[in-house]
Amino acid sequence: MRYLFPILFLTTLAIRADDYTGPRPPKPDMLYLVHASYLIPTEATEASQEGKKDDTTYTVAGAASPVRTPLAEPIFLLRSEKIKADTLELYRFEVKGGRRQLTLSRKRSEKSGPFHLSITKLDKDLYRVEADEALENGEYALSPSGSSNAAFCFEIY
């Protein structure tokens, strides 16, 4: 009887740890696009930054991301070590001159974002990140807010 409570407690913890049974990202701090039971790594890159008056333009090389999805409300998984899931923001690029660009200004544009995200903690360091609204076809990037220019790019077609 003396051991019954600790055994029940440990059993409860083991069951709770196994709640999420889906795929798990192989690398930390990388966003993976979920397609059924498959994980597709997003295009991880560093955006170059250029500032003019009230505008800041972020640029990524290439007219299109090689990572594509037909889903208007894509779902991503993140195994977090350095990147905090709640700092992620979703933006839409404009394609100009063979490059993807995002210009942020004091005059906010709902067309480029940030778009609403829903973030759900699945496990100790595992998060589900999903667009909380239907997105139009185009080029997009998830990026942690702050001083980083890291961009996790994908295309909706």
Feature names for model-found ranges:
Residues 3-13:
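Sec-dependent N-terminal signal peptides
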Residues 8, 141-143:
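Alpha-helix C-terminal capping segments
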Residues 18-102, 146-157:
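Primarily secretory-pathway and cell-envelope proteins
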Residues 74, 115-116, 125, 150:
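Residue-level marker for the onset of beta-strands and adjacent loop->beta junctions
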Residues 98, 109-111, 137-139, 150-151:
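A short local loop/turn or secondary-structure capping micro-motif enriched for an aromatic residue
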Residues 102-124:
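Extended, solvent-exposed segments with strong compositional bias
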Residues 118, 128-130, 153-155:
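Generic structural detector for well-ordered beta-strands
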Residues 125, 131-141:
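A glycine-anchored, Pro-Gly-centered beta-turn/N-cap motif
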